[in-house]
């Protein structure tokens, strides 16, 4: 029998969630570096450069890769020969205590994003608990643990279908990838779960993306003439066909949309073909450890020389400098799709909860806490600052969630432009076009890099909303791209179509 101390599991979980907040898995970094070298799309290559630079900065500074430090997920396998002689908590409670310590660490506080009463008050639990824990009792004397942090943007793009046994699984996946847009922050990993029951398929898809990026090994195996299993065949087929869609980094169009595709399957009922799809984003975060009774887990610290020699800096010649303090609607209307801008001056922030409260206040005729006239709003929920920071990592959140508020903001508050990540939907694009506005995108997965452009930050409204409060940021050379111009042209539509043609593997869909 192996005796595991309660404190060893708690501290190991706490250490793991801190670790993954600032260290990408090296297999992901290696694959992303190779994708950078291959990439021919200037916009996609620039986005990958920002992600790689941000990753190294986070590793050096021990600050989060992404402002969305995720909901904690743990896969734990407990050996049947393990005992917990000093335990006063359940395993769920131990894991939750580890998460609580990690997210409240004063040296690197992580953003608390978990809300209780999800269909009601949606109140923040303040410590990012409870974690979502998947248990398995297995033969053995050890405890095997995977800790992962998944952000809301990639989780929102998860898909499930109960297909008929005769349906084409590959066609279903290829139909869903464009539907997902760029909110899951490609390039990343796609996990496919096949079989079992609906909940089993989803769990398989989620578990699959915890494995190392190793599609290159599978390609080599296929090239050697070795026989592949059906899941391996599907991995290769989907990897090639998804990348042939031309979605590209951040949905801007390019050669690499996925760095790997994972497939796990399980027997299912003869009448069903359950299929699940779960993406892992540019902020891929997971680590694996085991406990054998000898103490807390020891996590290997990666070497900075393992990162590619890629350093992104603002291109002051190619990008247009914009003074937010004097910006006019006429200037916004003149921006062109794909144009690179460097923003300087003061902007406001606001995301889901702030937009909902603004809508409620306008409906009641109440005065807003801040004047949005001729202002730009940044969709962001930053991490709290530490030491000499003015704000913690502050990357963009998914713009489409604010689509239903876009016309209201443009026509009732005086707002003239917005910044987020990913594409905008038809409702928002129509409002942008009607109001001669524009939507700008910042790179998802480059939160620490973006934060370095923020020179001051203060809460100016809705302080009770925590990370969803309205801030005023003063920025210097903050990099963005015009994603939707005043005529309604979206680079998230034009870019992938252009690169799908260039890749030339499949016809452009109507």
Role assignments for model-derived ranges:
Residues 163, 205-209, 276-280, 293-295, ...:
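Short, solvent-exposed amphipathic alpha-helical segments in soluble enzyme
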Residues 209, 213-253, 349-481:
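Feature captures the catalytic cores and cofactor-binding loops of soluble hydro-lyases/lyases
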Residues 253-261, 268-269, 282, 452-510:
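C-terminal binding/interaction regions
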Residues 332-335, 341:
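Short, well-ordered loop/turn sites that connect or cap secondary structure elements
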Residues 341-343, 347:
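Generic structural signal for buried aliphatic residues
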């Amino acid at each position: 029998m192996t005796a595991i101390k309660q404190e060893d599991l708690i501290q190991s979980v706490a250490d793991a969630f801190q670790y993954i907040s600032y260290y990408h898995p090296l297999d992901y970094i290696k694959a992303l570096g190779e994708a950078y070298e291959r990439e021919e799309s200037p916009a996609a290559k620039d986005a990958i450069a920002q992600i790689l630079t941000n990753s190294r900065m986070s590793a050096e500074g021990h600050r989060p890769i992404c402002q969305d430090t995720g909901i904690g997920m743990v896969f734990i396998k407990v050996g049947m020969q393990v005992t917990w002689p000093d335990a006063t908590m359940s395993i769920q409670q131990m894991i939750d205590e580890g998460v609580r310590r990690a997210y409240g660490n004063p040296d690197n506080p992580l953003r608390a994003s978990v809300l209780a009463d999800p269909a009601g008050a949606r109140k923040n639990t303040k410590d990012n608990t409870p974690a979502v824990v998947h248990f398995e009792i297995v033969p053995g004397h050890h405890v095997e643990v995977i800790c992962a942090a998944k952000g809301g943007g990639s989780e929102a793009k998860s898909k499930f279908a109960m297909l008929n046994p005769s349906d084409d699984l590959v066609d279903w996946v290829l139909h869903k990838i464009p539907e997902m847009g760029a909110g899951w922050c490609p390039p990343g990993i796609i996990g496919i779960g096949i079989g079992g029951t609906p909940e089993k398929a989803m769990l398989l898809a989620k578990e699959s993306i915890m494995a190392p990026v190793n599609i290159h090994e599978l390609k080599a195996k296929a090239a050697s003439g070795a026989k592949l299993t059906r899941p391996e065949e599907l991995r290769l087929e989907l990897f090639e066909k998804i990348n042939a869609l031309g979605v590209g980094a951040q949905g801007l169009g390019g050669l690499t949309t996925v760095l790997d595709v994972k497939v796990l399957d399980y027997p299912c009922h003869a009448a069903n073909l359950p299929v699940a799809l779960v993406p892992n984003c540019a902020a891929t975060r997971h680590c694996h450890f085991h406990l054998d009774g000898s103490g807390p887990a020891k996590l290997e610290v990666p070497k900075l020389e393992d990162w590619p020699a890629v350093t992104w800096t603002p291109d002051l010649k190619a990008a247009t400098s914009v003074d937010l303090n004097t910006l006019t609607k006429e200037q916004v209307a003149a921006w062109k799709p794909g144009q690179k801008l460097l923003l300087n001056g003061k902007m406001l922030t606001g995301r889901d909860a702030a937009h909902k409260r603004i809508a409620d206040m306008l409906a009641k005729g109440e005065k807003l806490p801040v004047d949005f006239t001729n202002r730009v709003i940044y969709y962001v929920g930053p991490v709290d600052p530490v030491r000499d920071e003015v704000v913690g990592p502050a990357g963009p959140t998914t713009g489409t969630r604010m689509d239903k508020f876009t016309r209201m903001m443009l026509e009732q508050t005086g707002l003239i432009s917005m910044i987020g990540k990913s594409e905008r939907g038809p409702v928002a694009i129509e409002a942008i076009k009607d109001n001669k506005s524009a939507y700008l995108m910042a790179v998802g997965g480059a939160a620490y890099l973006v934060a370095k452009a923020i020179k001051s930050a203060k809460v100016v409204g809705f302080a009770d909303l925590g990370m969803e409060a309205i801030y005023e940021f003063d920025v210097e050379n903050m990099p963005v791209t015009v994603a939707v111009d005043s005529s309604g042209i979206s680079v998230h539509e034009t870019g992938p179509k252009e690169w799908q043609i260039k890749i030339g593997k499949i016809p452009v869909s109507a």
